[in-house]
């Protein structure tokens, strides 16, 4: 069973951090495997809007994108993803950001064009296995007002601690979030 600490806090105020809550669960007869931190390590990856997207001369797949990343002047980013288009909201790693795989973003020339960041897929951010193209965020913001320039983890509520609990046969009552909240209360 995976218990989201943030979701749990919608039901109760645990009064302790996720690690201590895990120890309390263990004392109550549940077996805590681990506490996994999610959404951290994405500093410098922001919500951005692709303003323009033009094919790069001499390439069959590269595009030069002008991107509003909330940093004042628009960024110019060379992107090879097949699904990039003008008007999209995307995840943009700005110069200096270090992605979960340890890759640090820097200004780089590609085919003679300066790229000032990287438009990222979910796999590059360590969030999912999808590497088919960049992560398009259109539709994630219900009111239509996207927080351009905001860290992606904060904007999408990705920062959480997940308690991974191995349920024993005598604790099937904790197969649901409400009973996990009751156990923590």
Stretch-by-stretch model annotation:
Residues 1-185:
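Phosphate-backbone binding interfaces of nucleic-acid-interacting proteins
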């Amino acid at each position: 069973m995976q218990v989201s600490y943030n979701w749990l806090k919608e039901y109760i105020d645990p009064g302790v951090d996720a690690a201590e809550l895990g120890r309390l669960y263990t004392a109550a007869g549940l077996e805590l495997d681990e506490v996994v931190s999610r959404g951290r390590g994405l500093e410098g990856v922001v919500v951005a809007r692709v303003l323009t997207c033009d094919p790069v001369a001499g390439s069959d797949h590269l595009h030069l994108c002008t991107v509003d990343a909330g940093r004042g002047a628009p960024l110019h980013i060379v992107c090879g993803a097949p699904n990039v288009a003008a008007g999209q909201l995307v995840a943009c790693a700005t110069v200096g950001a270090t992605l979960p795989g340890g890759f640090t973003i820097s200004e780089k020339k590609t085919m003679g064009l300066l790229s000032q960041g990287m438009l990222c897929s979910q796999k590059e951010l360590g969030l999912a296995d999808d590497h088919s193209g960049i992560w398009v965020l259109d539709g994630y913001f219900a009111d239509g007002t996207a927080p351009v320039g905001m860290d992606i983890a904060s904007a999408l509520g990705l920062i959480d601690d997940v308690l991974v609990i191995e349920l024993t046969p005598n604790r099937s009552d904790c197969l649901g979030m409400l009973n996990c909240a009751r156990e923590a209360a």
